[in-house]
């Protein structure tokens, strides 16, 4: 599979890079690399919509002229895999978790460690939302629990759930190559409780869950929220992330209509994670 690489130069990188990540994700871009002042974004060749990209960039320039320039390049598969891996740096979630790639040579770490073959999948831990939801997971009881991970990406949340004691984890990912990446990461970590499934909302099924993790984006979360609620056991926990802090009220209101009680909001650099309990 070939990918397009979009390279955008931002003149206020610190304040705008995460915002552009969210907007580009809404038009199909899947993976991102930050090299200030440049943001690199990647999308499968078959999914690229030039008109949608031009409209987005033009609209953003009218709202806030922070784009100094951009360049689009079609990359062959063997090139983007090597490029992505070369950019991947270890991720630390406090002193509790370290996320590394197989090629990293690091000093011993006292916390939990996950080995992730980065490739192009979303969810290596670099993005604020993945970092936030990993941090929040350490506050929950996973022992013996059944877990659903929607939009699993690399499978990092599923793998962490197993390390935290979950008995069964269903990792659903709509992109075929990401679902394959989950299988690779399951093998790298010796995981035995994670089931990787290529599919979308239709793959949720009817079996009940104790915990649901969904790190996607606001629009997808709103469209799938009722499906999550339908398979949550009484007192089950739902963690939502992948959206701006300013979007949280819309998700909280929608969840309340489904009997999901808002318990907690955590923020990190304008991104949020929401915790709900099934009443």
Question: Which role does the model predict for each range below?
Answer:
Residues 174-279:
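S-adenosylmethionine
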Residues 120, 124-205:
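Conserved SAM/SAH cofactor-binding pocket of Class I
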Residues 98, 113-117, 132, 149, ...:
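Conserved beta-strand segments that form the floor/walls of ligand-binding pockets within enzyme
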Residues 28-33, 144, 260-264:
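A short linear hydrophobic-aromatic micro-motif
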Residues 2-108:
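N-terminal auxiliary segments of SAM/dcSAM-dependent transferases
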Residues 91-128, 134:
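Proteins enriched for Cys/Gly/acidic motifs involved in redox and nucleic-acid/cofactor modification
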